[in-house]
């Protein structure tokens, strides 16, 4: 019976950690003043079936579609309400602590701040989660957004992502 109790406690601990991670930002979906976009694993599977290989070999869209076939979930939440933006920041800080995310980088320009966190894996080129918080961006978005959370989960190849970001940055 001691063994059963131990196994039950471990199972509960793992389950609560997993469900905490999944529901951390879900409550934002139901809040007034929050815009959300959620894309599921099934949607990524469908999107990855589109074939852009032939004449588009090597272009950005091909690389994007190769990358998304390993994604499980994409969520983004934004608000223009400062009080909700503060709540969102607290939620991200708690998620970072509970899920043991590693800070990848942070950036501050004027009143805007960006934090990017990742969940590392044993493979140094892959992360299982990318979490980004952008706060104080109302001036850049003409009042359309005060804060933004982006959560991406799956097998995320940091090298491919970096390469894509470089490509899009150079093209724009």
Residue ranges and their predicted role:
Residues 147-172:
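C-terminal partner/receptor-binding element of secreted or periplasmic proteins
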Residues 86-146:
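Surface-exposed, polar helix/loop patches in the mature regions of secreted/periplasmic/lumenal proteins
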Residues 67-74, 94-98, 167, 171:
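Structured segments of extracytoplasmic/periplasmic soluble domains
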Residues 41-43, 80, 120-122, 134-138, ...:
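A mature extracytoplasmic/lumenal domain signature
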Residues 43, 84, 88, 157-160, ...:
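Stable alpha-helical elements in mature extracytoplasmic
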Residues 24-83, 91:
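Early exported N-terminus immediately downstream of N-terminal targeting peptides
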Residues 1-27:
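Bacterial Sec-dependent N-terminal signal peptides
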């Amino acid at each position: 019976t001691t063994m059963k109790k131990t196994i039950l406690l471990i199972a509960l601990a793992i389950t609560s950690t997993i469900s905490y991670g999944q529901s951390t930002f879900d409550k934002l979906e139901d809040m007034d003043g929050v815009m959300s976009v959620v894309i599921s694993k099934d949607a990524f599977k469908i999107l990855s079936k589109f074939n852009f290989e032939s004449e588009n070999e090597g272009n950005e869209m091909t690389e994007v579609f190769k990358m998304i076939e390993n994604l499980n979930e994409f969520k983004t939440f934004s608000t223009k309400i400062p009080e909700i933006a503060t709540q969102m920041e607290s939620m991200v800080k708690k998620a970072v602590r509970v899920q043991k995310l590693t800070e990848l980088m942070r950036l501050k320009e004027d009143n805007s701040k960006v934090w990017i966190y990742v969940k590392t894996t044993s493979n140094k080129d892959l992360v299982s989660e990318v979490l980004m918080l952008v706060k104080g961006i109302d001036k850049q978005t003409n009042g359309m957004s005060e804060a933004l959370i982006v959560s991406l989960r799956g097998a995320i190849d940091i090298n491919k992502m970096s390469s894509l970001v470089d490509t899009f940055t150079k093209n724009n």
